[in-house]
């Protein structure tokens, strides 16, 4: 089987490039595509959108239509699927899932698709393994890392940035 994995940022891509081969094994293939943020689902699902904007949800209707048209030509013995990985952020899960399925239901043909929604930000995965953070960032701030409560809803990207980035989340936010 082949997997096309869409993720909202570069850090998610780096993590999935390492994790996915361990999950799917050698008999399957995959590509991870990162975007410059999650964005918003467009009101007009048929709109073309600006391809230069690499914003995940803004591009999703066109991406899913393209994957549907491509995957229909894959051999039956080697199917393909799209996996969308993104954060819930401040959205209502029930409404957000319905919006994603509304996009998928406009596709003809419809690609095999799974929506993987992190209730808290994906950075919570990283904060769940403090020794790995310390191995990658030996100068990471212990006080910040030790104050994090695993699986808490607390602004995890800010916590991770405060631990590993010079100037913390305010400095990173200032960069855009």
Feature roles, as predicted:
Residues 2, 13-176:
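C-terminal accessory helical subdomains adjacent to catalytic cores in phosphodiester-
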